[in-house]
Amino acid sequence: MKWGTPGMSSNRSFFNRGMFRQNLRQHGWISILYLLALIFVLPIQLVLAVNWDERFRRDPLDNLFVVQDTLQALILVVFPVITGVFITRYLQSKAAADLYHSLPLRRSHILANQLLCGGLIVLVPVWLTTGIMTLMTGNEQLSYLFESADVWYWGITASMVSLFLLVFTVFVGMCVGQSIFQTVVVYILLLLPAILVELMGLYLRKFIFGYPDSSLLGIAIEKLSPLVTVFTAYHLPLTWIDLLVYIGLCAVFVALSFLLYQRRHIEKAS
């Protein structure tokens, strides 16, 4: 397995072609499954719905997240996390960790290659699905249901959510040493803000007369958890401000991942 030219300076570029190809060979199947899942839950379901479901013939869609909303949300929150877990698995195996860190590459270069490969794995399926959906707007029956603007909004939102979940999973992977534990911690941390606010609201409603009930606080709670946000996107779409917040969070967690990676003791790999 040839990952670089012997003697190559590690300062030349963050991109290493050999490592990138190896990552795609190892983890490219995730991208293929992600693409097939998105095609099944959106283009195929829309074609079937137009032909068999009278509701879709009467009213245009509010947004594309209403199509198989629960299944679609599940796909969007599972595949990026799986990708993040797999591209950081080398840190949790002593042999793989030793192999990666014996390469003539700095840790920052290794992590940059992993993030780049992971980003392509989760983004390419979303972009291809967006392209398919854009072509479908040329169909007379389907163009009544949704427009190009709806497709691009879905594509941007799905891309941002996928990228954030990937980056956050990599960040957690820098802190823990087991893949299963990493996955559990990711979902717990993503739900934790909404759970804490809900518990605080229950406590305050019990002791403060006139404190607003959960129905008044529901929107704020839904915005606090990326997982809840995805599952409620069919009736509460993300705003452009929300997307900018996710971009900012991605930048923060990428920076923290690089910082933690530089300080991580590889000998702790199990």
Please tell me what each predicted stretch does.
Residues 2-6, 10-12, 48-66, 195-269:
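Terminal transmembrane helical anchor/hairpin motif
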Residues 62-66, 117-177, 186, 194-198, ...:
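Secretory targeting signals
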Residues 76-82, 159-169, 245-258:
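Hydrophobic cores of alpha-helical transmembrane segments in multi-pass inner/ER membrane proteins
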Residues 67-96:
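Long, hydrophobic alpha-helical segments
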Residues 87-120, 269:
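Helix-loop-helix units of permease transmembrane domains in multi-pass membrane transporters
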Residues 25-29, 33, 86, 108-129, ...:
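Alpha-helical transmembrane segments of multi-pass membrane proteins
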Residues 2-35:
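Aromatic- and glycine-rich beta-strand/loop motifs that create alpha-glucan
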Residues 26-53, 71-82, 186-196:
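Hydrophobic alpha-helical transmembrane segments of multi-pass membrane transport/permease proteins
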